[in-house]
Amino acid sequence: MLLIIDLQTAFINWFVGLGVSKDISAALWIPLPILVVIVGATIGVLVIVWLERKISAGVQQRIGPEFAGPLGVLQPLADGLKLVFKEDIIPSKADIWLFTLGPALVVIPVFLAYLVVPFGHDLVVADISLGVFFWIAISSIAPIGLLMSGYGSNNKYSFLGGLRAAAQAISYEIPLSLCVLAICLLSNSLSTVEIVEQQSAYGILGWNVWRQPIGFVSFLIAALAECERLPFDLPEAEEELVAGYQTEYSGMKFGLFYVGSYVNLLLSSLFATILYLGGWTSPITFSIPFQTSEIEIFAAFLGIGMTLLKAYLFIFLSILTRWTLPRVRIDQLLDLGWKFLLPISLGNLLLTASLRLAFY
């Protein structure tokens, strides 16, 4: 049984009960979902930064942050405030427009992609029929911002980092898209909500990860490369390029690159959950014979918690990968994308299409 909560109707009725007119209540609802997405993604980034510090400390047998709040949970907030109040320096020979627009062009598309991420049947800002392809298309804009930042800095290390970012994005965007296309072919839909609902019938046994194991592994590798996580962080390799395209940046512009990186990591983990692990659905199927407002609220929180739990499992694996695997060379990175992942993901798509024609 699908437990559906209509948040818009509940919100408007609640304000009408307080004496606010229905038109004003409907107008107040319009910016609320976008505001919730921005605040939620920002809080998710703070949690990821804290987890990265604590997990890396555990891998290296250290304690990690412990003074800024209990268990150091306020350390990411302190780091963010430090970057906000630092001086914003623009190199004298840099292209001011490219240098300034680059970080914004990296962050804004990633936040826009959250509009199609569902946390429940009606817990999605925009349930569009091309939700999956909207994510792929909008996330393809970020490498342009990285290239602009590297070119506009008028620095050889920044320019090389921007070129590497563009080459890496092109190399791994194609296998990632082919893996997603196989899921869409299997689900007969491009809507993120319908893809999750298609996996909800048999609990954990209905998840796409069992029907697409090759695509799942290929998707994870390509997603790590798209997020520029170790062992694929060639665009900002410290030993080779100082800080890559970030070399000349300081203050809040420098912080925007980190925000974009972690927001993109959370977004990729959420889409891995949606496409392969059933999204908000529980591993164990259950049905409730009646439906009340309290049960609807409980179902909404259960869906959000289930989605985030699965997503943070991927984030934990990516953090563990960063601190346990060495960085690959740029030629190895491109060989992995073009000579290994591309043929495998293409073969997986052809196999999925063949099985679809044979058994459906």
UniProtKB/Swiss-Prot annotation:
This is NAD(P)H-quinone oxidoreductase subunit 1, chloroplastic. Keywords: Chloroplast, Membrane, NAD, NADP, Plastid, Plastoquinone, Quinone, Thylakoid, Translocase, Transmembrane, Transmembrane helix. Its EC number is 7.1.1.-. Its main location: plastid. GO terms for biological process: aerobic respiration; photosynthesis, light reaction. GO terms for cellular component: chloroplast thylakoid membrane. The chain crosses the membrane at residues 29-49, 96-116, 128-148, 166-186, 204-224, 255-277, 297-317, 333-353. Belongs to the complex I subunit 1 family. HAMAP family: NDH1_NuoH. NDH is composed of at least 16 different subunits, 5 of which are encoded in the nucleus. It is a multi-pass membrane protein. It is found in: Plastid, Chloroplast thylakoid membrane. It catalyses: a plastoquinone + NADH + (n+1) H(+)(in) = a plastoquinol + NAD(+) + n H(+)(out); a plastoquinone + NADPH + (n+1) H(+)(in) = a plastoquinol + NADP(+) + n H(+)(out). NCBIfam families: PRK06076.1-2 (NF004741), PRK06076.1-5 (NF004744). PROSITE patterns: COMPLEX1_ND1_1, COMPLEX1_ND1_2. The keyword Plastid applies. NDH shuttles electrons from NAD(P)H:plastoquinone, via FMN and iron-sulfur (Fe-S) centers, to quinones in the photosynthetic chain and possibly in a chloroplast respiratory chain. The immediate electron acceptor for the enzyme in this species is believed to be plastoquinone. Couples the redox reaction to proton translocation, and thus conserves the redox energy in a proton gradient. GO terms for molecular function: NADH dehydrogenase activity; oxidoreductase activity, acting on NAD(P)H, quinone or similar compound as acceptor; quinone binding. It comes from Chlorokybus atmophyticus.
